[in-house]
Amino acid sequence: MASKVEKTHALPPCCSTESLISSIGLGIFCLVADRLLRFPIIQHNDWLRAISDNIVHGVIGMWSWAVVTGIRKKSDFGEVLLAGFLASVIDVDHFFQARSLSLQAALTLPRRPFLHCSTVIPIAVLSVKLAVHLFKLRDSWRFLPWMILVSWTSHHIRDGIRHGLWICPFGKTPPLPSSFYVISTLSLPHLCSFLMYLTGTRQTVSSKYGMRIDV
């Protein structure tokens, strides 16, 4: 009779009860957090609004990656924090575009900064994946392109409810419906997890640590 681990390997890991519950929680967080950010006390203070908005991006990035991988060991916490950092750090391009550390200048740009072009995401993902292969980095680094995909895509989708998606060189879409934002955000980790499962990335990373990541 097949062992429990072998049976689990045969199932898509993104379909476990725990990951489905976690992603529903993520969707609820998206709805609640964005409603809280509409409070006048936040909207009337540029610094508070910018920091709060960036924190929400970070939390969504962390939560999304936690759904992808599950948290089974201490190193997973480091990955989750890195995912949150990647989801938040995109906004630093506002200051680069403004060529100033002034928040007012960063918030009043004539056009969107370069990291907010959604075409950058597949370019960055493929570039990092190629670098991991060319430089023969450890198997434990094979998750990084997927983490960038999840973290940056979640950021772009959330920004899309206000500004639409900027897809160079084709222009931008209309603002995304809130329902699309929530459904896409809670579905994204499952899509990523399933693709990692199909490509063998999950098995490679988990075998490196002598265990299977169960999501």
Curated annotation (Swiss-Prot):
Keyword Transmembrane in record: yes
Localization of this protein: Membrane
Membrane topology: Multi-pass membrane protein
Principal subcellular localization: membrane
Residues spanning the membrane: 77-97, 114-134, 178-198
Keyword Cell inner membrane: no
Superkingdom of origin: Eukaryota
Alphabetized InterPro entries for the sequence: TMEM267
UniProt-recorded name of the protein: Transmembrane protein 267
